[in-house]
UniProtKB/Swiss-Prot annotation:
Pathway: Cofactor biosynthesis; adenosylcobalamin biosynthesis; adenosylcobalamin from cob(II)yrinate a,c-diamide: step 7/7. Keywords: Cell inner membrane, Cell membrane, Cobalamin biosynthesis, Magnesium, Membrane, Transferase, Transmembrane, Transmembrane helix. It comes from the Bacteria. Its cofactor is Mg(2+). This is Adenosylcobinamide-GDP ribazoletransferase. The gene is cobS. Coiled coil: none annotated. InterPro entries: CobS. It is an enzyme of class 2 (transferase). Belongs to the CobS family.
Length: 231
């Protein structure tokens, strides 16, 4: 179990983790999405406790993205470009695999960052743990109900997805019940967006990819943060 947890940290973040060769099962890292979320959440929580100055917030978000969210954000950009293209599924795959930033990705990514920074400035520090943990749980929901859209890539590597991983990942969120309203709001959004992305991706590309998983995480994190900033 510990090797799988370390593999999850190494796979989903830039936090240096010592890994023994051939230790850990890639398909089992899904059970620890929310565990990795605690690492990201505690980082953002700690940075916001130090200062809520705007320049410090920019630095906090930049470092947090570098350590924990850049991988997911890249998936968001590719997904935006691919899904807004009005064409065939094959052409969408081609656009998403290029890695270039197209007009849709540039425009909506700019809006995303502005909204993210605004919400970050207006949430309580503790809320950032809910954002990071439950935001990642939305990926479990997408994996639970979906199937990979391609026979290659990260989506395929995580398939077949063991349904019990959703429960394990949910169990890691139990400490967050300490603030029940925050938990209910965050969990509800994660469930809603994970399920919604399942239906959207089925219509667009007939399944999920690694990019779509990242986009789901980023959409969920922003939505949870905005919701918690309003209470």
């Amino acid at each position: 179990m510990w090797n799988d947890m370390k593999l999850a940290i190494a796979f989903l973040s830039r936090v240096p983790v010592p890994l023994k060769q051939n230790k850990g099962n890639l398909k089992k890292i899904c059970a620890y999405f929310t565990f990795v979320g605690y690492l990201a959440g505690v980082f953002y929580f700690s940075m916001k406790l130090i200062s809520e100055n705007f320049l410090w917030t920019l630095l906090s978000v930049a470092l947090g993205f570098y350590l924990f969210d850049l991988f997911h954000f890249d998936g968001l950009l590719d997904t935006l470009d691919g899904f807004f293209y009005q064409g065939t599924k094959e052409r969408r795959f081609e656009i998403m695999s290029k890695g270039d930033i197209g007009p849709f990705a540039f425009f909506y990514a700019a809006l995303y960052i502005v909204a993210y920074l605004y919400a970050f400035l207006h949430v309580d520090p503790i809320d950032l743990i809910y954002v990071a943990v439950l935001g990642r749980f939305s990926m479990n929901i997408l994996l639970h109900f979906g199937k990979p859209a391609k026979n290659t890539g990260l989506g395929k590597l995580l398939h077949p997805y063991e349904k019990k991983h959703t429960l394990i990942s949910l169990v890691f969120t139990i400490p967050l019940v300490y603030f029940p309203l925050n938990y209910i709001i965050s969990l509800s959004i994660a469930l809603l967006l994970g399920s919604s992305m399942h239906f959207i991706t089925n219509r667009k590309i007939e399944g999920y990819t690694g990019d779509v998983l990242g986009a789901t995480c980023m959409f969920s994190q922003l939505s949870i943060m905005v919701a918690l900033s309003l209470i």
